Every structure is written in C-alpha cells, then in structure tokens.
Amino acid sequence: LTAAAFQSGLTSAADLYIGGFDTHSTHDSLHEPLLAFSTDAIQLFWQIAEEKGIADRVTLVIGSDFGRTPHYNSTDGKDHWPIGSVVLMEKNAPWTNKIIGNTDEGHNAQKINPDTLEIDEKNGTVIYPKHVHKAVRRYLGIENSSVEENLEFTNTEDFNFFA
C-alpha cells in the first residue's frame, strides 16, 4: 500500500510500524522473531519498490525511539536505554556501508566530531536523533523549505553523514 501511494504520487513520506520490541522480560525469545520479521519486511519493501519502478526514488529511514539496555534484568528482559541507532537505505547510495558513532565498553555513546565523523571526546558531541533528522532533511533538499518552517532544528551541531 505504501509503495502504491508513492507510485501514484499521493504521498512522499510514510511511517510504517512494527511493534513488540518493548521487551522487559524474555527479551531474546521475543526479539529474535521480530528481527527476522523486520528483515523480511524490509526486503519485501525493496522488492515491491523495484517492481513498481520507484526504488531509485526511495530513502528508507529505520529507527526506534529508544534502545535496550546492554544487560538483562531479573526477568531476562531488557529495559529502556537512551542509546539507539538509525539505519538509512537508498538504492545505489554513494554513502553506503558506513557506521557513524560508537559506544564505550559500558555501551554509553561516545562523542563524535561533526566534521570528521570520528570519535572526539574533546571537540565532539553525542549524536542525537535531531542530528540525523537535520542531515536527512538537508540530503532530501527540504532543510529550508516551507514544510520545515515550524519544525526547524536550531542550535544543533551540523553533521554531514552523507559525504
């Protein structure tokens, strides 16, 4: 349905949701099938996008509002953790196979230099969702558009994740 809406021009963006990841107990047995389902869903999305001839116009952003703790709780679950990740996918993207950001041995975010994208505890900053969204908006050419007028990110470090 989403790919058909893109193909017809009815929409240029959509949110797709897969739930069940909030696993405060029996984490592994719940996450394993969810991750497999997610992988299959992403693969199917790209297959349909190819079939509909729109794959070269899609930027897929995959993320979550929070991560899971690096350790298990007393019920073999994992609780909320402020460190998450975002995956960006695009057909024939010039910025493929990059990992930007890092955590220390305690799974705490390390500071990243916005210019070099390397670990820099002195001059860097922790990457937050606002940095990713600002960079994606710029990449898509909507950073200073009327769409963003009341939703701009001010006083935010500027990362060029797509260089």
Regions inferred by a protein language model and the residue ranges of each:
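Membrane-interface soluble catalytic domains
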Residues: Q47-A55, T103-A163
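Extracellular/periplasmic catalytic domains that process cell-envelope and extracellular macromolecules
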Residues: F6-L10, G53-A55, K78-P82, A93
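Active-site histidine-anchored catalytic micro-motif
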Residues: P70-E90, W95-A109
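Metal-dependent active-site segment of extracytoplasmic phospho-/sulfohydrolases and closely related
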Residues: I42, W46-T75, H80
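Anion-binding catalytic surfaces of enzymes that hydrolyze or transfer phosphate/sulfate esters
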Residues: L1-K52
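Solvent-exposed loop/turn segments at secondary-structure junctions
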Residues: G20-T23, F66-T69, A93-W95
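Structural recognition of the beta-strand scaffold that forms the well-ordered cores
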Residues: S12-Y17, T59-I62, S85-L88
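Hydrophobic, well-ordered secondary-structure elements that form the walls
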Residues: D65, V86, V136
